[in-house]
């Protein structure tokens, strides 16, 4: 079960887009280690386009097109405008209202959930590039872990990007736990933020173990599951 509801996610989204926006007062040419070939400006352009794409989906039964960023528009203002439009549309609409989504349920609330980890992970990408230490709310990170297990991996499998996993990897954060795959099981206990970054391949298993995570069961099992195409 997710630790957040629609209203809680919207509050977190407001905070996350504001935190990402503050990154745009730094060096826009700083390389982003988590996204090879991108700098902070490229990352912000990507995220701003995703926000606008999601906003378009809220009022459509069909997949919207990605719109390019006009080259003459200042990046920080363009990002802020798109983020504000997304938050405003989500706040104005019933989370149960039908719309196009990447995966069931095909309702507005899907995007309220999807855009939070999207923004959180990219904020985590941007801040180290600017020498700023990132942090994440534990419940928000746990909601993102649940989304990978409940939405992203099933979608990857349905699209033929990932076959069924022959091993299982259980992820634990305190009393919360999630299981990926089936069969021989490894169990990793770590803070939810580390688990989220691990699933989105912003951390390696070695990184989180060095930071104090505890692994029981075969390490090879954990590595096999984590190497899979769990997310796009």
Residue ranges and their predicted role:
Residues 18, 26-65, 103-158:
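Short, contiguous alpha-helical
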């Amino acid at each position: 079960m997710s630790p957040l509801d629609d209203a809680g996610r919207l509050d977190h989204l407001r905070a996350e887009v504001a935190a990402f926006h503050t990154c745009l007062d730094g060096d826009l040419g700083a390389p982003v280690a988590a996204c090879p070939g991108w700098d902070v400006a490229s990352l912000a352009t990507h995220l701003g386009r995703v926000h606008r794409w999601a906003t378009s989906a809220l009022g459509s039964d069909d997949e919207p097109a990605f719109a390019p960023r006009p080259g003459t528009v200042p990046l920080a203002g363009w990002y802020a405008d798109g983020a504000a439009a997304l938050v405003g549309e989500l706040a104005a609409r019933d989370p149960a209202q039908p719309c196009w989504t990447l995966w069931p349920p095909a309702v507005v609330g899907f995007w309220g959930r999807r855009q939070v980890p999207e923004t959180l992970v990219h904020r985590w990408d941007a801040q180290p590039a600017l020498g700023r230490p990132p942090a994440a709310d534990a419940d928000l990170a746990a909601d993102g872990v649940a989304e990978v297990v409940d939405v992203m991996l099933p979608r990857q499998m349905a699209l033929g990007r990932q076959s069924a996993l022959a091993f299982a990897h259980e992820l634990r954060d305190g009393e919360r736990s999630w299981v990926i795959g089936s069969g021989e099981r490894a169990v990793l206990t770590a803070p939810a933020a580390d688990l989220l970054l691990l699933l989105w391949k912003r951390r390696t298993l070695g990184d989180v173990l060095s930071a104090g995570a505890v692994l029981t069961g075969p390490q090879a099992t954990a590595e096999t599951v984590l190497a899979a195409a769990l997310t796009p």
